[in-house]
């Protein structure tokens, strides 16, 4: 598969493996990767050396690697770091899709760099890469209202209405991936942040 090198060469969708977590809010990043695989004809394969399920797809002519880390959320950096090291992908060329409790269900926001905001998957990726300088695609799953309820909230399934909102957000985000690969960050932000 030969394609142009896009602005982002690796898209990591965060989540937890296994049927127990399949429909939970914490797996929103997995759902985005699944949608990209569906749209662009890729095939996710277990790649033990990369600690995740990986695919390589062409998106509007851009060669892009996708990964769903199979390390559980708190060790997501193992998969992202392994791929980045092997394929010599700098942090600036990595986009990480993840659930975001600080956004209402159905919201999508792009962010370059910054802190982890208490998200353990981002924390581990930042630690593994040695920098926060990777991009994030934040998929809103809403906040439960109290910090003691955050873990049960993200590890539970969304209501039917929230699920519809999240699915729409994932579609909207997937629609903008070609723009992001083309380096049209501002235009993608305008579409998603509107």
Curated annotation (Swiss-Prot):
Gene name, per UniProt, is pth
Site Discriminates between blocked and unblocked aminoacyl-tRNA — annotated at: 16
Keywords, in A-Z order: Cytoplasm, Hydrolase, RNA-binding, tRNA-binding
Active-site positions on this chain = 26 (proton acceptor)
- The name of this protein is Peptidyl-tRNA hydrolase
Task: Give the EC number(s) listed in the UniProt record.
Answer: 3.1.1.29
Tell me the first and last residues of the signal peptide.
none
Assembly:
Monomer.
Function per UniProt: Hydrolyzes ribosome-free peptidyl-tRNAs (with 1 or more amino acids incorporated), which drop off the ribosome during protein synthesis, or as a result of ribosome stalling. Catalyzes the release of premature peptidyl moieties from peptidyl-tRNA molecules trapped in stalled 50S ribosomal subunits, and thus maintains levels of free tRNAs and 50S ribosomes.
Principal localization reads: cytoplasm
Any keyword Iron?
Answer: no
- InterPro entries, A to Z: Pept_tRNA_hydro, Pept_tRNA_hydro_CS, Pept_tRNA_hydro_sf
């Amino acid at each position: 598969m030969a394609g142009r090198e896009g602005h982002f060469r690796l898209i990591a969708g965060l989540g937890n493996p296994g049927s127990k977590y399949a429909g939970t809010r914490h797996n929103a990043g997995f759902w985005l990767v699944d949608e990209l695989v569906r749209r662009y004809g890729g095939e996710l394969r277990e790649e033990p050396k990369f600690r995740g399920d990986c695919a390589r797809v062409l998106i509007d002519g851009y060669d892009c690697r996708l990964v769903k880390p199979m390390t559980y959320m708190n060790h997501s950096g193992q998969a992202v770091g392994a791929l980045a090291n092997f394929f010599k992908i700098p942090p600036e060329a990595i986009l990480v899709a993840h659930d975001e409790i600080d956004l209402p269900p159905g919201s999508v926001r792009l962010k370059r760099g910054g802190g982890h905001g208490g998200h353990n998957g981002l924390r581990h990726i930042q630690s593994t890469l040695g920098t926060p300088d990777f991009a994030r695609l934040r998929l809103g799953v809403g906040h439960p209202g109290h910090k003691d309820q955050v873990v049960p909230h993200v590890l539970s399934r969304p209501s039917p209405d929230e699920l519809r909102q999240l699915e729409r957000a994932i579609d909207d985000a997937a629609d903008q991936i070609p723009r992001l690969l083309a380096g049209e960050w501002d235009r993608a932000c305008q579409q998603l942040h509107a």
